[in-house]
């Protein structure tokens, strides 16, 4: 994977998992979020304001600036003057990224300064991935004809910090924490004409406390059902960041970075080397790490929060079901931590017993999260082989399904009045495809869990073995269009609101299957023929060409008479235009569709969808939005008119984008039960993945395009790996 030019944007975020961060690029330091809860002002203003604008020309400067003293002149390494720090602006040349590396080049007179910056990242090692530091490797070249004296350092806002020097480090203190900067050459260096000098510096920071937005308090999270007794005024203590378990101050962090930066580079290079993908795929996958840096908060208690930027919601269920794929592939314990956060906080008594939070302790949705939670638990059990979480989660899953069915059940399906689900402004009242597809696979997943535990799967007195077939029958009767070959978005009922356009072609109509697709038995619920027909219909019918970018995107919904699709929007307010989100292209629905194409034997189509998503995001892969365009009243592509801050580019990146890490799993057609792992890769692409960890099972796999033979441990064999037998090497090779 090569570096990508992002000179048009604000720059690259630096920091670790849950450490806070800053961005560095053409404007120097911006989006300074090392302290507290990140992007509070942006969240408070949303959907108004422009703080999300990744291409802004006049962002607020951070309180520090890198400088180069050349002879007697101070140059700040940023393209504009700083309002609080003296120095001449430099000439910005370019900014490139290969996450988590960022390269920025400036000219300060005759001196060319290239900065290679990065923070620590180590796959499968959260401790090494949560260090609040940034290394800066300087390559300084005298491009002039005369010698120059060069000195490098960090300048700061004197109104914000008090400074002292300790062990050759500049230490900047303020009331709630501080920063430290060190460099390996503290004396001025003389560079002759044409000479290059190399330096290594590091910035460390230390801000121990943060307070989240909403009701997320550590004295709630570990007390089952205590939410009913919540009093906000009693729970305003902050959390302590996890990195305080290892460091006492910012100077300790900066010193650690200067001592171990070469190891950090080795770890990063090993991460890159563990995967071999086509460049566009690699760019998306590694680029989505931007969202890890900008969205995570990690506590000393070991649990964490992921912010649904720009909303401030924490660990949002219908976001995490997507975004957690990055964690499952690199730090899989994080998915277990998050699921236990829900297991411990979902009420288990009273009227709301089993109600699953939309996001932790706040913003409960009407009826969309319970089924997602059940599928997500089973998916992680299959991934990890962890039977303990299966036992711990089972009663909560049962309660969740019973809550959903008792409040919204109708016949064997789910019937909701308003249809308020994950597609927000596009309400789908009555029998909603999105929710009922989940419902089918949640019932399936619960029965699979129950069988493993030797329990009978019963929901409100009904055996799931009888409820699921009836639900499947009613689902097809209500929503399947045999002539056109797809399931309707929704069907209104006597109970529900009477919104029109239920026969829209909904791009995410197989979301429940996508979430359950690790399980080989999931492929027998809906018929493969129906699924293939539906995917082909969506691919052709919902596709929109974006000439300014030369790529395709896929609408969330399109009417059978496609040209009439804009009529789905029914203006009923300034912000939530009813139906508007049908006219938008949701990145995760698109990537999910690409994966489903692979799952159902349509690899060329799947790769085409994923390629177009990647092309649409382009060099904004650090700033992917929730969407990548919508359409206007004439079906012409446009930036989202009501929510430009959710379109691409927007910063910080929207967390669902991390689901790109599920794409290689779909290419491998990886499936698993608790006895075996099954592989049957597509034959249209060369890929390699080293050390996929699924609990105690670890395997590496390489796939050669048009393969015809499978080797397991160097011996020709079926691609079936017995679980709990350690490490495996699997090769799919072409011999003919």
Regions found by a protein language model. Name each.
Residues 17-84, 177-179, 208-212, 216, ...:
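Acidic-aromatic substrate-binding/catalytic surfaces of carbohydrate-active enzymes
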Residues 36-105, 333-422, 547-569, 609-651:
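Helix-terminus loop motifs that line ligand-binding clefts
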């Amino acid at each position: 994977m090569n570096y990508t030019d992002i000179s048009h944007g604000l720059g690259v975020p630096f920091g670790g998992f849950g450490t806070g961060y800053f961005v560095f690029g053409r404007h120097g330091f911006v989006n300074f979020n090392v302290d507290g809860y990140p992007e509070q002002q942006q969240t408070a203003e949303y959907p108004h304001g422009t703080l999300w604008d990744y291409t802004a020309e006049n962002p607020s400067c951070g309180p520090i600036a890198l400088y180069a003293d050349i002879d007697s002149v101070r140059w700040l390494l940023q393209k504009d003057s700083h309002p609080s720090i003296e120095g001449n602006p430099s000439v910005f040349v370019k900014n490139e990224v290969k996450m988590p590396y960022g390269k920025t080049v400036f000219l300060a007179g005759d001196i060319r300064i290239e900065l290679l910056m990065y923070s620590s990242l180590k796959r499968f090692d959260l401790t090494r991935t949560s260090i609040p530091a940034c290394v800066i490797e300087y390559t300084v070249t005298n491009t002039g004809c005369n010698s120059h004296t060069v000195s490098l350092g960090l300048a700061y806002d004197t109104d914000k910090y008090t400074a002292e020097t300790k062990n050759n480090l500049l230490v900047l203190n303020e009331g709630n924490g501080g920063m430290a900067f060190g460099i390996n050459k503290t004396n001025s260096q003389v560079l002759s004409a044409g000479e290059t000098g190399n330096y290594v510096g590091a910035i460390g920071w230390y801000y121990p406390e943060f307070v989240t937005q909403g009701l997320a308090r550590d004295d709630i999270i570990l007390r089952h059902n205590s939410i009913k007794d919540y009093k906000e005024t009693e729970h305003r203590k902050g959390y302590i960041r996890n990195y305080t378990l290892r460091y006492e101050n910012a100077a300790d962090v900066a010193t650690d970075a200067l001592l171990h930066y070469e190891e950090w580079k080795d770890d990063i290079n090993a991460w890159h080397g563990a995967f071999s993908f086509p460049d566009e795929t690699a760019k998306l996958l590694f680029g989505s790490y931007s969202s890890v840096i900008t969205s995570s908060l990690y506590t000393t208690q070991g649990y964490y929060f992921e912010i649904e930027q720009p909303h401030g919601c924490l660990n949002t269920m219908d976001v995490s079901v997507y975004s957690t794929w990055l964690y499952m592939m690199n730090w899989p314990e994080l998915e277990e931590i998050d699921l236990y956060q829900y297991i411990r906080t979902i009420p288990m008594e009273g009227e709301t017993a089993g109600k699953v939070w939309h996001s932790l302790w706040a913003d409960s949705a009407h009826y969309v999260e319970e089924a997602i939670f059940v599928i997500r638990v089973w998916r992680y059990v299959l991934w990890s082989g962890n039977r303990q979480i299966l036992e711990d989660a089972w009663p909560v899953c049962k309660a969740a399904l019973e809550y959903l069915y008792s409040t919204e059940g109708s016949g064997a399906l789910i019937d909701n009045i308003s249809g308020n689900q994950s597609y927000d402004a596009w309400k789908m009242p009555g029998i909603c495809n999105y929710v009922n597809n989940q419902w089918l696979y949640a019932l399936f997943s619960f029965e699979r869990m129950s069988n493993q535990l030797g329990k009978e799967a019963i929901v409100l007195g009904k055996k799931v073995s009888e409820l699921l077939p009836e639900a499947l029958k009613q689902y097809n009767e209500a929503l399947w269009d045999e002539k056109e070959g797809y399931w309707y978005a929704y069907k209104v009922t006597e109970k529900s609101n009477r919104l029109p356009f239920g026969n829209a072609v909904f791009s995410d109509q197989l979301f429940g299957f996508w979430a359950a697709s690790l399980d080989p038995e999931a492929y027998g619920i809906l018929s493969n023929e129906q699924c293939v027909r539906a995917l082909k219909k969506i691919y052709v019918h919902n596709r929109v060409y974006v000439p300014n970018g030369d790529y395709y995107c896929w609408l969330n919904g399109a009417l059978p008479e496609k040209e009439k699709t804009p009529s789905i929007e029914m203006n009923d307010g300034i912000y939530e235009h009813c139906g508007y989100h049908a006219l938008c292209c949701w990145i995760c629905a698109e990537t999910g569709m690409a994966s489903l194409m692979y799952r159902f034997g349509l690899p060329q189509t799947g790769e085409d969808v994923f390629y177009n998503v990647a092309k649409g995001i382009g060099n904004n892969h650090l700033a992917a939005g929730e969407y990548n365009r919508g359409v206007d009243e004439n079906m012409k592509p446009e930036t989202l008119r009501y929510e430009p801050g959710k379109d691409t580019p927007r910063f910080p990146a929207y967390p669902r984008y991390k689901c790109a890490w599920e794409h290689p799993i779909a290419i491998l057609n990886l499936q698993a039960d608790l006895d075996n792992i099954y592989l049957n890769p597509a034959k249209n692409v060369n890929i390699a993945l080293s050390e996929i960890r699924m609990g105690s099972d670890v395997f590496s796999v390489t796939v050669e395009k048009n393969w015809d033979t499978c080797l397991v441990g160097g011996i020709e064999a079926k691609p079936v790996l017995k679980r709990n037998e350690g490490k495996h090497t699997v090769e799919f090779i072409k011999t003919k």
